[in-house]
């Protein structure tokens, strides 16, 4: 009798998969951060990037939740961005206790400059990674991210 193979990955395979994703993230973030202009850190760029792709304004709490960091860590990042003139932090018009954060035109310009500064890194990756492989992997990674994102919110 032949044993039926499971289509489910083993725990060891999943551990190795997520370990590889983690190492890739560390490597790319280190390279990416070296290319960022004007002393911008990856966490600061990530907040500016969030504003460019998700919403024009948010509370510090919403940002902390989106980035899965403590409110204190997000406040620290926002203070640094504000001191550089990249975000504006104002009182919320509906609540005296809450604040709203938005990207400034200077922040938008630096975000574009940062994206452009990473172009050589992206171009190098494009030369060394076949498009078909990237597209297949991207689809799978998006499914994993969506699954993990749903679990985070439940």
For the regions a protein language model found, what residue spans apply to each?
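Base-recognition residues in the alpha-helical recognition helix of bacterial helix-turn-helix
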Residues: 19, 46-50, 75-77
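Short glycine/proline-centered loop/turn elements that form peptide/ligand docking sites
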Residues: 37-41, 73-76, 80, 130
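N-terminal leader segment of winged-helix/HTH proteins
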Residues: 1-38
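N-terminal helix-turn-helix DNA-binding core of bacterial DNA-binding proteins
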Residues: 30-70
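Terminal interaction helix/tail motif
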Residues: 113-154
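N-terminal positioning helix adjacent to the helix-turn-helix/winged-helix DNA-binding module
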Residues: 13, 36, 43-44, 106, ...
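Canonical helix-turn-helix DNA-binding module
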Residues: 55-108
């Amino acid at each position: 009798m032949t044993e039926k193979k499971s289509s489910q990955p083993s725990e060891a395979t999943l551990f190795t998969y997520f370990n590889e994703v983690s190492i890739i993230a560390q490597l790319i973030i280190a390279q990416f951060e070296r290319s960022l202009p004007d002393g911008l850190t990856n966490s600061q760029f990530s907040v500016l990037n969030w504003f460019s792709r998700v919403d024009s304004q948010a509370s510090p709490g919403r940002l902390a939740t989106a980035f899965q960091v403590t409110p204190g860590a997000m406040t620290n990042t926002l203070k640094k961005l504000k001191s550089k003139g990249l975000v504006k932090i104002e009182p919320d018009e509906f609540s005296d206790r809450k604040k709203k954060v938005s990207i400034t035109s200077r922040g938008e310009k630096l975000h574009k400059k940062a994206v452009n500064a990473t172009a050589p890194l992206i171009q190098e990756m494009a030369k060394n990674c076949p498009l078909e492989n990237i597209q297949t992997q991207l689809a799978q990674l998006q499914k994993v991210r969506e699954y993990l994102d749903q679990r985070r919110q439940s």
